[in-house]
């Protein structure tokens, strides 16, 4: 049993993007992307999808115990916000010979 291969899509969300969660238990939450995982089309968003992990004692955490941390959510469950706070889908276009991301709803360039 290996890892299922998923067709890799262009990076819609990048580290540092402000996003709004549009599905799941944290629907409506606006937060910052901590990590983008393009190979599995997921992102880790600050304060969203908190899970409890049973941590074995280590040098950093000598007592071990139950630790709460953010888990990855699928990139289709978030929308990127532009500078005005408008959530929309992300598209790509060329500006001055450079490929940039833009918000399809507002037309504002994200990069």
From Swiss-Prot:
SUPFAM superfamilies: Translation proteins SH3-like domain. GO terms for biological process: translation. Gene3D superfamilies: 2.30.30.30. GO terms for cellular component: ribonucleoprotein complex; ribosome. Keywords: Ribonucleoprotein, Ribosomal protein, RNA-binding, rRNA-binding. One of its GO terms (molecular function) is rRNA binding. Signal peptide: none annotated. Belongs to the universal ribosomal protein uL24 family. Part of the 50S ribosomal subunit. One of two assembly initiator proteins, it binds directly to the 5'-end of the 23S rRNA, where it nucleates assembly of the 50S subunit. HAMAP family: Ribosomal_uL24_B. This is Large ribosomal subunit protein uL24. It comes from Streptococcus pneumoniae (strain Hungary19A-6). The gene is rplX.
